[in-house]
Amino acid sequence: MQEQYNPQKIESKIQRYWEENKVFKVTEDESKEKYYCLSMFPYPSGRLHMGHVRNYTIGDVVSRFQRLKGKNVMQPMGWDAFGLPAENAAIKNKTAPAKWTYENIDYMRTQLKQLGFGYDWDREIATCHPEYYKWEQWFFTKLYEKGLVYKKMSTVNWDPVDQTVLANEQVIDGRGWRSGAVVEQKEIPQWFIKITDYAQELLDDLDKLEDWPEQVKTMQRNWIGRSEGCDIEFKRTDNNETFSVYTTRPDTFMGVTYVAVAAGHPIAKEAAKNSDSVALFVEECKNNKVSEADMATMEKKGIATGFFATHPLTGEQVPIWIANFVLMHYGSGAVMAVPAHDQRDFEFATAYGLDIKQVIAPVTGSDLEVNLNKEAFTDKGVLVNSGEFDGLDFDAAFNAIADKLEALGVGERKVNFRLRDWGVSRQRYWGSPIPMLSDEDGNELAATDDMLPVRLPEDVVMNGVTSPIKADPNWAKTTMNGAPAFHETDTFDTFMESSWYYARYCSPRHDEGMLDPAAANYWLPVNQYIGGIEHAILHLLYSRFFHKLLRDFGLVDSDEPFDRLLCQGMVLAETFYRKDEKGADIWISPSDVNTETDDKGRVTKAWHKVDGNPVFSSGMSKMSKSKNNGIDPQHVIAQYGADTVRLFMMFTAPPEQTLEWSDAGVEGAHRFLKRVWKYAVDVKTVGFQPLNKTALNNEQKVLRRDLHKAIAKVSDDVERRQTFNTAIAAIMELSNKLLKAPLNSKQDVAIANEALEAMLIMLAPITPHLSHQLWQELGKEGDIVNASWPEVDQSALVEDEKLIIIQVNGKLRAKLTVAADATKEQVEALAFEQASVTKYTDGVTVRKVIYVPGKLLNVVAN
């Protein structure tokens, strides 16, 4: 056995052993409880970063722990391989996206193996493989047949440089998040899936997800955005044409003083034909900031159309305005404006001199005040200036006004959702072709099963402008039912692939269907899912939706895909910079910088390793290419080993919080593993002795009690609380006690044997290479990965004696060791035998004695 811990000598050897013996290969086994642990699969960008390492280390720790608990554990890995970065890299490197992607996959797979992750590599998938996207295409055609897919013209955010549609969240300050180009509003035909048909179920079933972070569930609830209100019809005064608005506040309806429509609304388009100034404003709105955060903070602008509408209940004429804060793809593209009771409407009305009419007053006795010279009164209250509805509270007014609108045939109660149908068309090349066609007359046709997969050609040349399948007229040409037909040249949104990959892992080589139902129903739902909170809405919502679709097609028998969700925090690192001659920041890698720090680890001085000149610290920020502060996992593994990296990742912060990279912290983790190794050498040297619980002295009982307390804490911290950092702290505390304990008597050695075995198993999920090697060195049977998690010996936790704190008037005066079953009277008698106690009680009156059993006795005297 090596005297010193040397990870470079053992880790690659152990990884080969795991691979050659398929240690992590798993199949369905009805005799065992299953456990499916999944970390969000990576985009094959070329190299793993520390964010990946943290995510996958957490998943591996959970997986290995559950295996040690006796469960049949599946932990797969694959690649979210389609997407725009591959196209950009292909253009830059003059290669095909497929070639670039497959090379990256090969490299990153090697990196994952070097970190010792226990994946069943026989289940590996890549979403760019036709064998994968074939079934996605098949499912899309079935959704089309069921009426859950449709095509329509849609106003989209168009990036003129990347030539693709952007989600609202991908538009930053009116520009494309990747290209930086000014985003345009453009109408193009797009395919949609009717996620809105499942909106209520998606909302309701959030209540079933008891082991999801509340923050994620709240974000999804807000995104789905269920509201109860009224659809109300307004009639134009010039041509009697009607248009509808939706409101959640019908109680304010009598206070409508204008109506606002989106720039894309038919009324706005008509007005633009009549007025150059209106046309100019409508064009300006096309370049609006369109994310919701931007909409909330941007300046509210508008222009009058010159048209008016009739208020359905008062008969008053109200002007119709075009406003930049009304979006065509939300609701009907028109809103009723009540400036007295909506702050946005108030700001707009104030800016343009529009009427403000109060129709809600505070409830009698309320301390709320109304000051319409300053701001809108947005609270609920009682109606005023509302004719027959005066005096009604919110609920009564809601129903009374809704009843009247319905009776007059100009409105109806309606449940509305903010959620919109999922637009899955993308105008890029590197994605799954959408399995739809059109005939010469433009009629829609779904690809038949024998046409699938509709293959994406991989040997292509990227020109940086047009998708190769759009540029090649021959690619789209085919025949269907003996007649000419043309393939759709748009590709799927890559969220399509990531919305069902978790299910395909259950039967990745199944070629007779999308899923093998028996395998899917054995493994699903995923017991533990791990990934960043940035996926809280789109990916996690689409996956939940897809799972319900799979259920309704009889492919799975559960309602939700992921039982438990853990969202890990970001990895931060110190950032360093210099100024160039123009005053711009030049970011310098932390690996090129020497530093001095204060006692709290804060950088006080920094200089470049090469030239010795000073550099400046900009503090901690997320590891990124833009700030050049990423730490290459390969460098750290080469220096310290994978187990050190894993231990640092799990120990430095709770999993859901940000983790600050620290070279000193990495060194500390490495020192701990060296101490564990040394302890194992010492224990092996003294040999094995059987444990005799009846022969233990008091010190040995205390040490064994500490061991089993640690087992209990680590078990709970890892399984229930998922506070892996505190679990590791408990193991470290135990190891310190073990290292100080003597190895002289037989029972000293017996306890050391028991403790070392338990400690190696508890460390095995976190530092699997070290635990595997020491397990073998100690001559233990089998592989540690197949060992059983240590059980708590309850008898070891029973204390013969207790340490009791003695206080007088709340101040510590003595500490007494008493029998564990000592009564209050016995402890009190012993306390009053102590001179350090009687010094403060003699000559005064003892008012009462308070006893907290097994912990504290406080004498109150004066």
From Swiss-Prot:
Q: Which GO terms describe its cellular component?
A: cytosol
UniProt keyword annotations, A-Z: Aminoacyl-tRNA synthetase, ATP-binding, Cytoplasm, Ligase, Nucleotide-binding, Protein biosynthesis
Q: Where is this motif: 'KMSKS' region?
A: 622-626
Signal peptide range equals none
Q: Which reaction does it catalyse?
A: tRNA(Leu) + L-leucine + ATP = L-leucyl-tRNA(Leu) + AMP + diphosphate
Return the broad EC class. ligase
CDD domains recorded: Anticodon_Ia_Leu_BEm, LeuRS_core
Q: Where are the transmembrane segments?
A: none
Task: Give binding positions for ATP.
Answer: 625
Tell me one GO molecular function of this protein.
leucine-tRNA ligase activity
Give a yes or no for keyword Cytoplasm in this entry.
Answer: yes
Q: What Enzyme Commission number(s) apply to this enzyme?
A: 6.1.1.4
Enumerate the Gene Ontology biological process terms.
leucyl-tRNA aminoacylation
Pfam families named in the record: Anticodon_1 (PF08264), tRNA-synt_1 (PF00133), tRNA-synt_1_2 (PF13603), tRNA-synt_1g (PF09334)
Q: Where in the cell is it found?
A: Cytoplasm
Keyword check for Translocase? no
Q: Which family does this protein fall into?
A: Belongs to the class-I aminoacyl-tRNA synthetase family.
Q: This chain belongs to which protein, by name?
A: Leucine--tRNA ligase
What species is given as this protein's source? Pseudoalteromonas translucida (strain TAC 125)
